[in-house]
Amino acid sequence: MEPVAIENRPYPYFATEANLLKGIKESAAEGLFKSFQLLLGKDVRENGVKFEVLLGVYSNVIQYIKFLETSLAVGCINTEFKDLRRMTNGKIQFKINVPTIAHGDGRRPTKQRQYIVLKTANKHHISTEMELAVLDLEILHSSQETALDVTEYIGAVKTITSALQFGVDALERGLVDTVLHVKLRSAPPMFIYKTLNDPTIVERGMKKTVKSDLVAMFKAHLVEHTFFLDKAQYASQSVQYVMTMLSDMAATVCNETVFKGIASYTTPSGEVVDGVLETTDNVMRKLLAMLGQSGNSIVGPASYASYVVRGDNLVTAVSYGRAMVAFDQFVSRLVDNPNATPSSVEDDLNAISSAAGLGQQNRMAIPSSVIRVGDKTIAVESLQNMYTEAQVPFPLNRRLQYSYYFPVGLHMPKPKYSTSNVIRGAENPLYQPVEAWVVNKNNTLLRFDYTCALRSLCHPKVHNPNPCAGALQAAFPEAPERMEAHGLEYEQPPHMNAHRLMFDYYNGKNVAHVTHIARKTSMSTDDLLHPSAHELLKLEVHPLFDFYAVGAPGARGVAYRATHRGMVGNIPQSLAPAGFQECRGDQFETAACLSHVVDAATIEVVQQSAFDPNYPVICYLIEAMVHGQEEKFVMNAQLIALVIESYWTNTGRLAFVNSFHMIKFICQHLGGAAVSKEVYGLYRRIYGEIVALEQALVKVAGHDDINRRHVGEYTNSLLDPSLLPPFVYNNVFGAFFNRVDRHAEVHVGNYAVDSYNDMAGILNVTDRMEDLVGRFVNLYNNRVDDDHEHRFQLDVGVFRDAENILVLEKIFYYVFLPVCTNGHVCGMGVDFNNLALALAYNGPVYAPAVNGADPILDHLENGTLRDLLQASDVAPTVDMIRTLATSFLTCPVNTQHARVKTRRDPGQAVATHERAKLVGQTLLVNGFAAFAISERNRPACETMFFPVPFHKFYSDPMVAATLQPMIADYVNQIPSQRDVLAFNVPPTIMAEYEEWHKSPMAQYARSCAPTPLSLSTMVCMHNKLSPVAFVNQAKNRIHPGFALTVVRTDEVLSENILYSSRASTSVFVGLPSVTRKEVRSDAVTFEIHHELATLNTSLGYSSILVPAHVASITTDMGVHCQDLFAMYPGEQFADREMHNYLKKKVGAAQGQHNGPDARHLLNAGFACHGPPGLSHGQLATCEVILTPVTADVSYFQSSNSPRGRASCVVSCEPYNAESAENFIYNHSLSDPAYEFRATVNPWASQLGSLGDVMYNASYKQMMAPGLYSPCRQFFNKEDLLKNNRGLYGLVNEYITRLGGAPATSGTDLQFVVINGTDVFLEQPCLFLQEAFPTLSASHRALIDEYMSYKQTHAPVHFNQHLIEEVAPVKRLFKQGNKLVY
């Protein structure tokens, strides 16, 4: 074949490839082409075996030149092993001598200890395919008679050569890839290895303390030194830091190998290359740019050493670092003549090296970047391009996942302080944060507030107590030592005599019970979270429910039940303190633009009146005679005006401030000159304040409606018609049944009705006096003849006001009066017959000869009425008392009580038992709110009045004690009963667990300051703990009563550095073999197999892996919150209208179905679609964990478990599940990370808590596919224990290899990466059970300060806080031209 013919061919395709043919001929010594001529016959497939042999020869000629030219080979001893396929197991044994120290103090010398260590070879099989066309093979062996034949011949050679070159190149890359993976398999992460290899740590053994130290050091090194190149970029001494890290890498690995003193690779000047850094192109450029390079080439062997086989055992032909040339020489010197004259090592080396003149291997210069790190010379290389060309992921690029967390809505405890001297305008200590400002990966400032979390907070799963009760039942099946015994259920009274009920209950009572609600309310946050309070804390598992244990039939005798807390104010003050509630009150004022009508001075006047021990008792008589009837007020207006004016003139205080109706009537009828302008203005301001609060409530509630019901009924209890005022004088039941559609019931004694039409038998409506003139005789007969104790009828007047007056009345009795009196009020019953006797049966009243204009005291004899008038310092006329006595004609006989029950709000309707679906209240019919009675007036009052503690706001035991000596004896005998929180009330009157108002609200009323803000606070405390209320409060930026722990998992693409010490791995390269895989009519497919073997020749871990640089953050690090409506589409509220309203308001995914049919999840009936586009990368899903607002902010400033309690149990026994579970869940033990408390979040850390049942897959929730939960890894009990066992085993395995107990021939332990190491590296939060704090602030001003004053920024500013990012990824924050790193 002449060159001219090639040049003149008409196809330019051949011209560019001519040199390739020449190169192939030279490299194969033209033997390949001659060998193909042996393929004779028409069908080349008949001679397949011959071709395989020839192909093997060809492949063997040009194989693996490139691997020896890589710097990766520095870490290897590369040996050709032609009979590798015959090896079944390859092992090397060598000895380890344990050094000893000679002592001169008389101690006995330590004997020499020697271990035989066994190294095992691992075989690797790499293979590739190539396909040769049958037509090309035929053309290759045909004769070339014409120019066209020559052209076809050249084309066939090119095609076959290209296929061969592809296969050879694949094998070359396969060898490099195999060796790199072998190195990675022996390269633990630096944060693990450096810690475990520290003799200062491991020499103490593996006790609990050492394990906990190790975990702490893992975390410290992980945070401080991961991605060290990024940290060095902005460090002041970046070069020194990088050099320190590289030096630590080189010093940490084991540099001792079996081949002592071997130096296969050196610099051109002869310096030994100590190791190699394998990394990515980007990291390599950064390193060389920062450190510079000391050389650009190294000198290494140009060919492989040789190994031989004897039987089934691998026998090394490398001794003391030099290659044995022939097996015969080995046998003659070491095997066949073992008894020859002993020779020195030098003689052996000389003899080995002298054979065949091959004492020195051929060596060549290899291009490579070389750096100098301390006293070590290290080669630096990137093999990334090889993987990029092959479109295969580079093993040194990894995806790491880090979990972050930050709080939303925390409340800073008193005293409020600031560590900033630059922030201005955010000093208001009442400014309660309802948001968190975070920075995403593109430095965009984002706000996470409660609006973002509504798709989780409003889901039915959050409002369902049954999973928590079931989990508690499973976790604590045995009855606790102390079960709740008081206030659980209301009992029907057998009669209507309230005085007798009080007497029967308190007479001889010497035992008192304190409910769990009261105990939690009276405790401080630290006391409740202390391990000593674990029995109480165990049932504090849900922010929306009060759980308690009751006796149940069965061997274990316990059942767990829950009742809804109903309102934000009912959350115990230890978890929602008074200061926090006042911050919410301030938010309510801001949202409603509320301008108070009353001021602190007005409230102080009311409080002084309530605390006045000489409060006029005549006021109670007048109030009883009027009992809410406007006509009677008008009749007695002169007397009322006289009492008001006299009391104001004498003391500067207000009369009748305990009665809403009296204040309303005063404002309506006593204007002008009836009373002084100043005192009348006070009454007007009080009434105006109530109206202003009602208008603010309506304004904040908005104008939406749900199923033709105003949304205010779902947001605030004061607007809910199911809640009635506590004192009833008129027939409010008609309006009640008309407005309420939630199965309302009215219980009078042992009678119950559920509709207004059925109330005729239990309701006696009394009309005006002028309309009852002809029935006075009947009224008198009924009063005298009836058995009123068993007359189950309520005596009420006609209700003539607008329905909204009930809202005003509720605001007065549930907000204004408790706040202004600090709860020092008690319900009071009246015996109207005795009151009439004291009032009317006096001479001047009936004697017509007495002038009606005369002062009655001039004619009144000594008696009850005279004493009361003198004590009240009031001098009415005779006509005034006569008119007052006339009011008795239509008065009821005595004070009664009724029980009203309704089903709860649809958002609160799910319950553990049937009675918990109802909420009740006791109404005091024709009763009054009484202040303390003075000792002087007590004898007279005892004959007419008696205490009726029927409501948490109206059950002050100290006030009741002034009305009833028996109660006074009771509270003196049991001091704990002097507190309204613990005061026991007859179960026939009320039961706290079933009430609207509970101990926490009474506690706030007791302790609040007499200011207008306290009024707003009490109004806001009536906001419901319901999903509709959450939506409303989020819209108005009002705190819902609980904080959030937001958890997010972000993914990072990391570029890693692998450091390997020299000659630490022996690589055996066998011969390739070719097999025919597939034969078709047009082509033959061959598979080239190649066997390799590797053996770790180091005496320890010779390689180490370090994440050096963040290539990219793939997730957006944003505020996209989990949509539980999409995650759990099968769970819905029973009220369909409310459910659809919520989904619309929160922006939940609108599924393709509305029913809770789980089959939709299985047949693709439900699909969760993301946004149509992305701006910052993949959305990182945030999940929220409900958290008490009292959670310690410092907890979130360092890496911790989002559960609120440490979960990393590496210091426990690995397979002792009981010990591990106690560590995680037993709150009678302190949190191992914070000894002074058991948890920071009882709603998530305990078994059966809300967070536990929401994110713990152990409870087998039916979840939609394709949704990721970042919280699950911190809550799933089985995974917790499994990962902790994995971490325990990982530490133990590494310690076994590094801690002074070397592997022996009996243990066969190898220095490889332990199972779980990759998970630890890529998901450290999973093993450590901790999330990292991310940069967040409760106020944007703190972020601005952080960007402007990096060194002096404020982590705390009154009620605001800043949390710095403490994580392995050190981000550069940028806003405008301001940079913070």
UniProtKB/Swiss-Prot annotation:
Q: Where in the cell is it found?
A: Virion; Host nucleus
A Gene Ontology cellular-component term: host cell nucleus
* SUPFAM superfamilies to which the protein is assigned, alphabetical: Major capsid protein VP5
* Keyword Zinc belongs to the record: no
Q: Could you tell me the superkingdom of the organism this chain comes from?
A: Viruses
Pfam families in UniProt: Herpes_MCP
Q: Which keywords appear in this protein's UniProt record, sorted alphabetically?
A: Capsid protein, Host nucleus, T=16 icosahedral capsid protein, Virion
Principal localisation:
virion
What InterPro entries does the database record attribute to this sequence? Herpes_MCP, Herpes_MCP_upper_sf
Gene Ontology molecular functions: structural molecule activity
What role does this protein play? Self-assembles to form an icosahedral capsid with a T=16 symmetry, about 200 nm in diameter, and consisting of 150 hexons and 12 pentons (total of 162 capsomers). Hexons form the edges and faces of the capsid and are each composed of six MCP molecules. In contrast, one penton is found at each of the 12 vertices. Eleven of the pentons are MCP pentamers, while the last vertex is occupied by the portal complex.
Family as reported in the entry's similarity comment: Belongs to the herpesviridae major capsid protein family.
Q: Quaternary form?
A: Homomultimer. Makes the hexons and eleven out of twelve pentons. Interacts with triplex proteins 1/TRX1 and 2/TRX2; adjacent capsomers are linked together in groups of three by triplexes, heterotrimeric complexes composed of one molecule of TRX1 and two molecules of TRX2. Interacts with scaffold protein; this interaction allows efficient MCP transport to the host nucleus. Interacts with capsid vertex component 2/CVC2. Interacts with the small capsomere-interacting protein/SCP.
The name on file for this protein is: Major capsid protein
